[in-house]
Amino acid sequence: MYQDVNEVDNQELTNDIVTVSKLQVGLRIRADQIQEGLIHLVEQVGSNNMDELFTLLQQVASLLLDYSTFWSHVLASSQTVGSRQVAETLFNQLSLQERTKLTKDALVHAMQDGRKGGGGVLDNSNTYVVVTLLLGTADDQPIFGEIYSGSLLRDTLQDISMMRSRYLMAFDLIWNPQLSTDKLTETDMTTDYGDMVAIA
């Protein structure tokens, strides 16, 4: 006998089981449109209520799909935990870990510009932007597995964009570098994002 779909949904939404997921997409990119696009999307969010955050999540997933030709690296992890308190702690740890990289890389790049006399033009042939999506959802199992290919990443982003809104409990969007005038170098990718894998 199969459980009614609504009954399963209600169990997932009311129990203490939470899935915390991180999806990172690295883009080898010459233009600055994706950073400007992300800034624009965030500016449209008037508050941190879940409806607006869910809309932001859908829009970011769609934007990343639009830039699929620039995908270079990916990292995916989705972990289910047995309590909301543990999930919140894990989510905050992941967020802090990623946001710490923003300050570090911005400082390093500023020092490099200073040594060069400032105003230098980046060689964009091997520069990157990394976009990180952190999600806390009411799912009772991981929402995706490991991702190594562009096709799997595309499917995952499409699934995220079609997620049921009531399942979203937390969402954090982080991209590095924050400014459209800055990019990550090969060295930055190796140092700070060495666990990401090249997309096959």
Q: Predicted regions: what is each one?
A:
Residues 76-93, 184-187:
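Charge-rich, acidic-biased intrinsically disordered regions
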